[in-house]
Structure formats: C-alpha cells, structure tokens
Curated annotation (Swiss-Prot):
Pathway listed: Cofactor biosynthesis; NAD(+) biosynthesis; quinolinate from iminoaspartate: step 1/1
Binding site for [4Fe-4S] cluster: 86, 172, 260
Function text: Catalyzes the condensation of iminoaspartate with dihydroxyacetone phosphate to form quinolinate.
Gene3D superfamilies reported for this sequence: NadA-like (3.40.50.10800)
Assigned keywords, A-Z: 4Fe-4S, Cytoplasm, Iron, Iron-sulfur, Metal-binding, Pyridine nucleotide biosynthesis, Transferase
Protein name as annotated: Quinolinate synthase
Family: Belongs to the quinolinate synthase family. Type 2 subfamily.
Species assigned in the record: Caldicellulosiruptor saccharolyticus (strain ATCC 43494 / DSM 8903 / Tp8T 6331)
Subcellular localization: Cytoplasm
Record-linked HAMAP family: NadA_type2
Length: 303
C-alpha cells in the first residue's frame, strides 16, 4: 500500500468534491493526520454546522455522521465504514423513550449524543461529554431523564445534585473495562502522574481522577498543565493529539484494552473510497431530522 499516493488522491478528491474531512480523537493516527478538523463530539458538531463545503467525510462512528447530517441536512455526509457502529448507542431505542415518557410525563429527556437519530428526535435536548453538566444545569426542568450512558449520567448527577435525575442503564463497553484496581496499580507505577479520565468511566474510577472531561478537555488540560506525566483513562486514539501537542510530556494509558474497535474501522483507503464513490452516504427520514435537529440546536443554545 502506497500511503503517500493515497493521501495525494484524498487531497485531490477533496478539491474536486468541495469536501472536508472531520475526525474524532479516537481515530487511527493516519486519519487524524489527514483530517481538516480533529476533536470531540461537541467540537465536530459545531464544525459541521458552520462549514460551507458540500461534502462532509465523517471519520468516526455512525451516530456522529448522523449528527452531522442532522445539523447540515443540505450537505452530503459520508461515513467511510458503514458498519462503524456504537454499542452504547444501540442500548436505547425510540420505543424505550416512548415508554419513559409515558411512565414519567413530568420529566424532560436529556440525551447523550452517543445515540441513534430516532432517539434524539424524541428527546428535549442533546448533550456531549464536554457540556452535559452545563446542559442539565441550564435546562428549565428540574426533573430529568438522562440517557443512554449511566456513567456520564452519574457524573452529571453528582455535579447537579439539586435536580431529580433518572438514569438509563447504558454504558460504553470500552470505558467500562477500567476498574478501581487498574487505577490503583497505575498510580502506584506512576506516582507523579495526574489521572485524567473520561466521564464514561465507572463512578469509582471518576472519583479517583485529578481531572474528568471529554477528549478535547483532556487534551487541553494536559497541554496547559505544568505536570509532566499523565495517566489517561480513555480510548488510546487520544494519544496522537496528546503527544503531538506535548512532545516533552509522558502519557500512560490506564488499561491496555482501551481500544474502540468501531472507531478503528476507518482507514485511509476507506476515506479515499468514500470520496471516490460517494459512500457511504447518510440519509435520515425528514421527520426524524426535524425533531433531532431541534434537540441539537437546543444543545448549542444552552451551551
């Protein structure tokens, strides 16, 4: 495989199609290197809403590409690997939301962006890991159903104790691998290092952290910190940006299993093929787009 040749082809196809490539922080290094924008879900949501290009190639997982389409329905949104899904997003359905609304009519639905478009469409507002606390705190209803991630929900609940928050039982299978024992071992091995974790981690892991935040917030914290060593409790794709921005600092992944197999499905070849063959295009029913867009725009308003 001639990597440089594929990169040149991607650049040429981008010009021809008036396209941009956006990539999540968990993507493989080669994709982050060629992307026009790299970041967390919230940052990429704003990018997709604001850019004027005709085509968005979203290097992430399915729900992220859906969100890009919802915010920019007039644009062509391509997901290089159509089977790049998210087990967490699959833990909630629109039927589940209907049941919750029937059971708790006075509660508002705050939906984590890691969810299907049809679920977003039935929610009152969307949030990301970077703004979940702010969204719940600023939302005008004190009765909240937070879905689908129970760990992020637990983190929010602790930060906003004045609100009545019901949690759904979903979780990220990658972050869920980290246990308290892993943290204690890592801290023993690297006593000078600060522990930075994602709020999708278990509550007992989050409690031991020096900083809790989204991938972008973790990168920003490590970059601005005077500390020289960090234990990182999130998917290892984040190491690319951490090391690039902080070549003089040391980073240790908290658990060797911190790899999201779905995030790693996108490759340079599949990005090239996405642009070459217009695949795989994200299409969403108009009524779903309308409801989900309203909830996503509410997020941008409240944050």
């Amino acid at each position: 495989m001639d990597i440089e040749k594929i990169k040149r082809e991607i650049e040429e196809l981008k010009r021809q199609k008036n396209a941009i490539i956006v990539a999540h922080n968990y993507q493989i290094d080669e994709i982050q290197e060629i992307a026009d924008f790299v970041g967390d879900s919230f940052y990429l949501s704003k990018v997709c809403a604001e850019r004027t290009e005709d085509v968005i190639v979203f290097c992430g997982v399915h729900f992220m590409a859906e969100s890009a389409k919802i915010l920019s329905p007039q644009k062509k949104v391509l997901l290089p690997e159509i089977d790049a899904g998210c087990p967490l997003a699959d833990m909630i359905t629109e039927e589940d939301v209907d049941s919750l609304k029937e059971k708790y009519p006075d509660y508002s639905i705050v939906c984590y962006i890691n969810s299907p478009a049809a679920v977003k469409a039935k929610s009152d507002v969307i949030c990301t890991s970077s703004n979940a606390v702010k969204i719940v705190r600023n939302f005008p209803n004190d009765k909240i159903i937070f879905l689908p991630d129970k760990n992020l929900g637990s983190f929010v609940k602790k930060q906003v104790p004045e609100k009545d928050i019901i949690l759904w039982e979903g979780f990220c299978i990658t972050h869920y691998k980290i246990k308290k024992e892993d943290v204690l071992k890592a801290k023993e091995a690297h006593p000078e290092a600060l522990l930075l974790v994602h709020p999708e981690c278990r509550p007992e892991v989050v409690e031991l952290a020096d900083f809790v935040g989204s991938t972008k917030q973790i990168i920003d914290f490590a970059t601005s910190s005077k500390a020289k060593e960090f234990i990182i409790g999130t998917e290892m794709g984040i190491l690319y940006s951490l090391k690039k921005r902080n070549p003089d600092k040391k980073f240790y992944i908290l658990h060797p299993g911190m790899i999201c197999p779905n995030m790693k499905k996108n490759t340079l070849e599949s990005v090239r093929n996405a642009l070459l063959y217009d695949r795989y295009e994200i299409n969403i029913e108009e009524n779903v787009v309308e409801g989900a867009r309203k909830a996503l725009l509410k997020m941008l308003e409240l944050s």
